[in-house]
């Protein structure tokens, strides 16, 4: 049944909010994600179709009605907002159809009325937006306060707004997932491949010109780092500064005394500093910026920022950077930036390699790097396709959850109507008593209860599918973290090719030329030759010192590339793939077992459903 669901509006059209701009109908990845084109403006009124759409147009024709309905949506009662916050835990502004059905099921309205309310507000979509959700709550109030709950419509709602009571609902807890996913989604995403704790020996020093870590370069992988990873939580603060500036609340379980607020520009500043300090380290990609972003774009960027900070706090060198520590802990970050000059010198100027570190660099390092460089584009392409296919699967799973909720509503409505359709429910002339009576039919009553049990079964199926959506979202973030690792090393190769170049050969030729000139001046011994020789010798000494510094930088760059390849990339690649897929298989196995339990329980319940 669900293998080939019917086409529905906005059900299967997947677009990556961080990869596509607002152009409608564009193929995946065709447009520049850094484009400043505004996002499409979301609808401010509930989406309705056919009959309900015509009612909406009739309302629009009357200015007072339009103003009243929009007034409810734009300035809803506190209860409406509270219910939305309980169901929309991720802050996307949308609520799943299954969650809305569970909430409306506590209204004590007939199943037929609940189905009609959801039909008026959602039609064929798998989620309800904020305006649609508020409209559904208002329809519940209208149905509860009307003599005939079935006699509801958008037009009647508009006429009744002035004296509309609050809905009587008892929200239940959202379906919980397994303990492995019980932590917040934000904390569970962004797979950390290194222990994020700061070593006790790490110190941070600051003066008028510098602010950097004094911790030496780590050259060995840490044991069992995945047992105690640093968890980073990033949430979008609803309030804005100005008309387009969003702030993010950042919290770490291992640093600081509480959450801190940061703007997107602060992330840009941090990555700019880290790229200048650590050009030969793996740096995670920074998500793009967009003017007038959509809610989907903001949510995708929030998750990308979690992955970025999780990677930085997992990296054995970057996690000890003092600027990163201040970024994650300082409550007055903006004032600190203004009063503290931050050094952006390369780490090679402040860190020296030990003899053991220099000797650990393999002589065939270039061959090892070339081997990865040749295969990196293919790996990156495969991971990109995996992410796209997983997100398409997520859309299909969301549609299945919505369809299960619709199946539950329809079957429960049928269960209520079956006994009423029986001929025995009609009052007639009883030959024996001579008066009209309506008799109960045991067969139809039993069949109706069976239909109700089937509806309850579909409710359970919808809840399990919703849990599956949450699990799949977590594993998609794991896949994106793995993809980001390959993308980050690809960017590292680009920086290495660009920034590892030096002018040692030019300086050597210049020193050799001066040496020859000095020898000729000494042989000629013309007047004033001593001063000219001293001048040339001083210049040669400066160039020789620069050559020594650049040669030491070459060795340091090679050590960095070897460390990133053999320790960071090698360990992260293995751990992310192994643990990510193990968790995925375990979650899928448990979800399948729970679904089988639902069907088995329904099978046992339907044994008592009468046939005749």
From Swiss-Prot:
Keywords: Cytoplasm, Membrane, Protein transport, Transport
Domain PX: 226-334
Protein known as: Sorting nexin MVP1
Major localisation: cytoplasm
Organism: Cryptococcus neoformans var. neoformans serotype D (strain JEC21 / ATCC MYA-565)
Functional note: Required for vacuolar protein sorting.
Region Disordered: start-end pairs: 35-68
Domain of life of the native organism: Eukaryota
């Amino acid at each position: 049944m669900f293998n080939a669901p019917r086409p529905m509006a906005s059900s299967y059209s997947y677009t990556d909010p961080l990869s596509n701009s607002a152009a409608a109908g564009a193929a995946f990845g065709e447009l520049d994600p850094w484009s400043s084109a505004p996002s499409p403006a979301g609808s401010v009124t509930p989406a309705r179709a056919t009959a309900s759409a015509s009612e909406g147009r009739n309302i629009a024709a009357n200015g007072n009605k339009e103003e009243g309905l929009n007034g409810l949506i734009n300035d809803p009662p506190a209860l409406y907002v509270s219910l939305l916050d309980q169901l929309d835990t991720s802050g996307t502004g949308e609520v799943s159809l299954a969650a809305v059905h569970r909430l409306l099921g506590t209204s004590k309205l007939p199943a037929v009325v609940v189905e009609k309310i959801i039909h008026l507000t959602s039609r064929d979509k798998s989620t309800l937006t904020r305006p649609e959700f508020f409209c559904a709550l208002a329809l519940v109030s209208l149905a509860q306060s009307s003599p005939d709950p079935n006699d509801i419509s958008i037009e009647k709602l508009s006429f009744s707004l002035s004296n509309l009571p609050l809905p009587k609902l008892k929200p239940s807890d959202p379906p919980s997932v397994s303990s492995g996913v019980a932590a917040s989604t934000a904390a569970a995403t962004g797979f950390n491949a290194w222990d994020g704790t700061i070593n006790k020996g790490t110190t941070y020093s600051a003066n008028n010109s510098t602010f950097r870590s004094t911790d030496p370069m780590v050259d060995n992988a840490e044991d069992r780092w995945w047992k105690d990873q640093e968890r980073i939580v990033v949430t979008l603060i609803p309030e804005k500064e100005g008309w387009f500036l969003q702030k993010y609340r950042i919290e770490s379980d291992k640093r600081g005394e509480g959450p801190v607020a940061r703007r997107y520009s602060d992330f840009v500043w941090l990555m700019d500093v880290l790229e200048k300090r650590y050009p030969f380290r793996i740096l995670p990609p920074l998500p793009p910026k967009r003017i007038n972003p959509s809610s989907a774009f903001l949510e995708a960027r929030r998750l990308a920022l979690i992955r970025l900070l999780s990677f930085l706090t997992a990296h054995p060198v970057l996690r000890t950077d003092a600027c990163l520590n201040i970024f994650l802990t300082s409550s007055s970050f903006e004032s600190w930036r203004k009063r503290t000059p931050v050094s952006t010198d390369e780490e090679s100027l402040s860190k020296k390699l030990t003899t053991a570190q220099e000797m650990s660099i393999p002589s065939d390092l270039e061959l090892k790097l070339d081997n990865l460089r040749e295969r990196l584009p293919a790996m990156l392409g495969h991971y990109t396709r995996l992410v796209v296919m997983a997100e398409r699967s997520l859309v299909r799973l969301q549609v299945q959850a919505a369809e299960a909720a619709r199946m539950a509503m329809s079957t429960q409505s049928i269960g209520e109507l079956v006994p009423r359709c029986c001929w025995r429910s009609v009052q007639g002339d009883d030959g024996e008593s001579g008066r009209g009576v309506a008799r109960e039919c045991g067969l139809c009553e039993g069949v109706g209860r069976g239909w109700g049990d089937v509806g309850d079964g579909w409710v359970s199926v919808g809840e399990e599918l919703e849990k599956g959506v949450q699990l799949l979202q977590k594993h998609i973030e794991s896949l994106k973290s793995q993809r980001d690792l390959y993308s980050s090393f690809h960017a590292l190769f680009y920086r290495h090719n660009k920034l590892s170049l030096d002018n040692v050969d030019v300086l050597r030729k210049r020193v050799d030329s001066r040496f020859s000139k000095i020898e000729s001046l000494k042989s000629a011994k013309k007047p004033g030759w001593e001063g000219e020789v001293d001048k040339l010798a001083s210049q040669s000494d400066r160039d020789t010192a620069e050559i020594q510094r650049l040669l030491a930088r070459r060795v340091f760059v090679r050590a960095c590339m070897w460390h990133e390849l053999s320790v960071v990339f090698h360990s992260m690649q293995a751990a992310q793939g192994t643990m990510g897929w193990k968790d995925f298989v375990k979650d899928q196995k448990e979800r399948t077992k729970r679904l089988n339990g639902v069907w088995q329980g329904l099978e046992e319940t339907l044994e008592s459903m009468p046939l005749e």
